């Protein structure tokens, strides 16, 4: 099941937390340290493959937080909808001559743009649960479009 935690950051960036994510000083002041949610987080991840859009965010954040908290590293399987979308739409940036000949950049791999290509309704971004649901909807559309029910999960994770 879906779940999220707001944790107190080690380095406060009020401009990002409030503007992008809507997390206020009140939220941060009453939130636990990462160490308090590490055990339930690891339990929630055990035996599961994490679904994300742009794995570097989750892997870098969780990797850094676990390293800072425990001194250990954290490796976990991830299915990345951005990576799956890049397989269908490889990144292409045409040079001057190619542009002159009418070549276009590859489409954006951002979550909202990828969802739009599959005719999935827009959503309000930058809330953990909403982003998770939006990513799950995109994943279902990608599976129906690009893969078969027999596709092993090992072909999808990175």
Set out the residue ranges of the language-model regions.
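Beta-strand segments within the central parallel beta-sheet cores of soluble alpha/beta enzyme folds
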Residues: 77-80, 154
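Acidic donor-binding loop at a coil-to-helix junction in glycosyltransferase catalytic cores
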Residues: 130
């Amino acid at each position: 099941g879906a779940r999220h935690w707001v944790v107190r950051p080690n380095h406060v960036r009020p401009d990002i937390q409030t503007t992008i994510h809507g997390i206020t000083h009140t939220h941060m002041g009453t939130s636990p340290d990462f160490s308090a949610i590490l055990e339930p987080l690891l339990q929630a991840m055990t035996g599961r493959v994490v679904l994300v859009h742009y794995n570097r965010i989750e892997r870098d954040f969780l990797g850094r937080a676990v390293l800072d908290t425990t001194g250990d590293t954290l490796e976990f399987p991830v299915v990345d909808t951005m990576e799956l979308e890049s397989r269908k739409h490889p990144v292409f940036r045409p040079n001057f001559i190619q542009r002159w000949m009418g070549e276009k950049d590859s489409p954006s791999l951002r979550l909202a743009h990828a969802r739009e290509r599959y005719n999935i309704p827009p959503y309000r971004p930058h809330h953990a649960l909403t982003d998770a649901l939006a990513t799950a909807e995109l994943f279902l559309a990608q599976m129906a479009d690009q893969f078969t029910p027999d596709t092993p999960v090992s072909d999808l994770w990175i």
